[in-house]
A protein has these predicted regions:
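Hydrophobic alpha-helical transmembrane segments in multi-pass integral membrane proteins
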Residues: 223-228, 276-294, 411-421
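Interfacial loop-to-helix junctions that mark the boundaries of transmembrane helices
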Residues: 18-29, 157-170, 209-212, 231-241, ...
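Membrane-embedded alpha-helical segments and adjacent helix-loop junctions characteristic
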Residues: 15-108, 267-269, 273-351, 355-356
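Transmembrane alpha-helix interface/packing and boundary motifs in multi-pass membrane proteins
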Residues: 74-83, 114-126, 230-232, 321-336, ...
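Re-entrant/interfacial helical elements at transmembrane boundaries that shape
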Residues: 52-53, 86-97, 110-111, 124-144, ...
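Juxtamembrane helix-boundary/capping and inter-helix hinge elements in multi-pass membrane proteins
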Residues: 45-48, 58-63, 96-107, 135-162, ...
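Juxtamembrane and boundary regions of transmembrane helices in multi-pass small-molecule transporters
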Residues: 104-107, 111, 122-126, 146-212, ...
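Single conserved hydrophobic/aromatic residue that forms the stacking wall/gate
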Residues: 1-7, 11
Length: 491
C-alpha cells in the first residue's frame, strides 16, 4: 500500500518515469538490511539462538528475574549487531516456547525483550532501522549529494559506522541499570520466584544442530562486522560489505540450495522501506518537508545563540530529541526518521547549529521513542504479531504501561548525557569516556552492594535500600512515639 500510494502520488504530481522513481530508493539501506537478514537466516538454522535460551535458563538457576536479565542482555547485544527486527524475529518463538516449558506468561517476557532490543539497537548504526537510515542518509557522500549539493558545506559533519558507537553507546550504557530497575518495579509480581525444570531435557531438545555451519557462518559474520568498523578507512559502502558477507555465507553453507535461506528474508519489510523512500521524496518535491522544517527551525531560532552558541545548541538538541521520541512513539520511528533526515540538514544550515549533535538527537529520540507504544517500532509490531499467532495477544494498553515510562526514563537520561557532552563538553571525546567510566564504576558498585547482601548478579543490578530505609524509619518512629508518650519499649 505504501509503495502504490507513494508511486501514484509521484506520478500524478511530477509525471516521473519508473526509472526516476527507483532512483529515489536508498539502495544502501535496502542492501544492508537484505545482507544482514540473509546472514542471520543462515545462522538461525544452526540452532544457536535456541541454545542461547537454554543457556540463559541454566545460568539463571531457576530464578525468573535472573532469566529476564540474561534474556534482555542477550537481546540487546544481538540487536546492536544484527538489527532489532531480525533479533526479535529469531528470539520471539524461542522465548514463547521457553515460557511454556517454565509455565510463565510469555507476554511480560516478550515486552521486556523488545524494550531492551530497541535500547540495545540504538547503540550501533546497524542495530535499529532508524540508525541504518540515518547512517545512510546523513553520511558525508549522501549530504554532499542532497538536493543538488545544497548542503555540501555540511558534508564534513556526516556520520559513519564508528561514529554511532562512539557517540551513542556511552549514552545507551547510562540507561541500562535504571531501565532494569524500572522493569523490575513494573513487573515485580510477574518476575519474582523460581521455576525448576529438567535442564537435560531442554538441552536435548534445543541444542545446537550444526556446529560446522555455526563456526563457518560465525566467522563470516565476524568479518562483516570487522568490515563495518573499517569503513572509515576502506570507504567501502556498508551495504556491499553486508551483501558480500551474505553471498559468501550462502556459497559456503548452501551452495546447492538457495531457496530456503532466501525465504528467511523479510521481503515485505524491504518493500515497505522502498515505498517509504519514494513517499518521502514525493513529500520533499511537494514542499511538505521544507514546510515542517521551517516551523521547527523558527522554534529553535527563537532561542538566542548565547556564548559560543551553547543556548541555541542545547535548545535544538532537546527539542529535536523529545519531539523525535514522542512522535516516534505514535507514528512509528521509521517513517518519522525518513521524514526528519532532510529536515535536520535544513535546521543545521538555517539555524546555524552544529549538525553532529542534531543527528544524535534524532537517532536517540527515534530509537528510544520506539519503546513508547506498540506501534512505535517495527520490532514491537513483529513481536506482537508473532505472539498473537502463538495465542498470546499483546494489547496496546499493556505495552503502553511498560513502554511509555521506559521511553520517558531513558530519554531523560540521554538528555542529561547530550547536554553534558555537547553543550558543556563541546563534543570532546574525554567527556564521553568520563561518563562511560562513571557509568561502569556505578554498575560495579551496584553489583558489589547487592552481592555483599547475598544476592545474585541479576538481583544485585536492581538492589536498593528502600525496604531497609523503610524498616529503619519505622523503628525510629516507634521509638520516638514511645518516648513522647512516656511508655517503655516492652509496654
Amino acid at each position: 500500500l505504501t509503495v502504490s500510494s507513494a508511486a501514484s502520488d509521484v506520478y500524478k504530481r511530477q509525471a516521473l518515469s519508473l526509472k526516476a522513481v527507483t532512483t529515489m530508493i536508498d539502495w544502501e539501506t535496502i542492501g544492508l538490511l537484505l545482507g544482514m537478514m540473509v546472514m542471520v537466516g543462515v545462522i538461525s538454522h544452526t540452532g544457536v539462538f535456541e541454545w542461547f535460551a537454554v543457556e540463559a535458563y541454566k545460568r539463571s538457576e531457576g530464578s525468573i528475574w535472573s532469566l529476564v536479565v540474561i534474556l534482555c542482555i542477550v537481546t540487546a547485544v544481538l540487536s546492536a549487531f544484527l538489527d532489532n527486527v531480525t533479533t526479535i524475529l529469531l528470539l520471539t518463538p524461542v522465548t514463547i516456547q521457553l515460557a511454556k516449558v517454565l509455565d510463565l506468561q510469555p507476554v511480560p517476557l516478550l515486552i521486556a525483550e523488545v524494550l531492551f532490543s530497541n535500547i540495545g539497537g540504538a547503540a550501533t548504526m546497524i542495530g535499529d532501522p532508524p540508525n541504518i537510515m540515518i547512517g545512510s542518509g546523513l553520511s558525508p557522500d549522501a549530504i554532499e549529494r542532497a538536493e543538488g549539493g545544497k548542503y555540501a558545506e555540511l558534508a564534513a559533519d556526516g556520520v559513519n559506522f564508528n561514529d554511532f558507537i562512539i557517540e551513542m553507546a556511552p549514552g545507551i550504557m547510562m540507561t541500562v541499570v535504571p531501565a532494569f530497575m524500572l522493569l523490575k518495579w513494573m513487573y515485580r509480581d510477574e518476575f519474582s520466584g523460581k521455576r525448576i525444570r529438567d535442564v537435560a531435557e531442554l538441552e536435548s531438545k534445543y541444542g545446537i544442530k550444526d556446529y560446522k555451519m555455526l563456526t563457518t557462518s560465525g566467522f563470516i559474520l565476524g568479518l562483516v562486522i570487522l568490515g563495518f568498523f573499517l569503513h572509515p578507512i576502506t570507504h567501502m559502502p556498508v551495504s556491499w560489505i553486508a551483501l558480500g558477507g551474505a553471498v559468501l555465507m550462502l556459497l559456503v553453507t548452501n551452495r546447492h540450495e538457495l531457496d530456503e535461506p532466501l525465504e528467511e528474508v523479510e521481503w515485505t519489510t524491504l518493500l515497505f522501506f522502498a515505498g517509504l523512500f519514494v513517499l518521502v521524496h514525493s513529500l520533499q518535491y511537494m514542499g511538505v518537508i521544507n514546510f515542517i522544517g521551517e516551523y521547527v527551525e523558527q522554534a529553535i531560532v527563537w532561542f538566542p545563540q548565547g556564548e559560543d552558541g551553547i543556548i541555541r545548541l542545547t535548545a535544538a538538541m532537546l527539542i529535536l530529541l523529545w519531539v523525535s521520541a514522542v512522535a516516534s512513539a505514535f507514528i512509528d520511528n521509521i517513517p518519522y526518521t525518513a521524514t526528519m533526515i532532510p529536515i535536520v540538514l535544513q535546521i543545521s544550515q538555517g539555524a546555524n547549529v552544529d549538525l553532529g549533535p542534531l543527528i544524535w538527537a534524532l537517532a536517540f529520540g527515534a530509537c528510544l521513542g520506539g519503546n513508547g507504544t506498540l506501534i512505535g517500532a517495527s520490532a514491537n509490531v513483529v513481536m506482537a504479531g508473532m505472539s498473537e499467532e502463538a495465542g498470546y495477544p499483546v494489547s496496546f494498553n499493556e505495552f503502553f504501561k511498560a513502554g511509555f515510562p521506559m521511553m520517558i526514563l531513558t530519554t531523560a537520561i540521554v538528555s542529561l548525557y547530550m547536554v553534558l557532552v555537547y553543550a558543556v563538553g563541546g563534543g570532546d571525546v574525554m567527556w564521553k569516556l568520563a561518563l562511560l567510566g562513571i557509568t561502569m564504576i556505578g554498575i560495579v558498585y551496584q553489583v558489589y552492594r547487592g552481592r555483599s547482601k547475598g544476592k545474585n548478579l541479576a538481583e544485585s543490578l536492581v538492589d536498593h535500600d528502600l525496604e531497609e530505609l523503610k524498616d529503619l524509619a519505622g523503628e525510629k518512629l516507634g521509638k520516638a512515639k514511645s518516648a513522647v508518650m512516656g511508655i517503655t519499649e516492652a509496654e
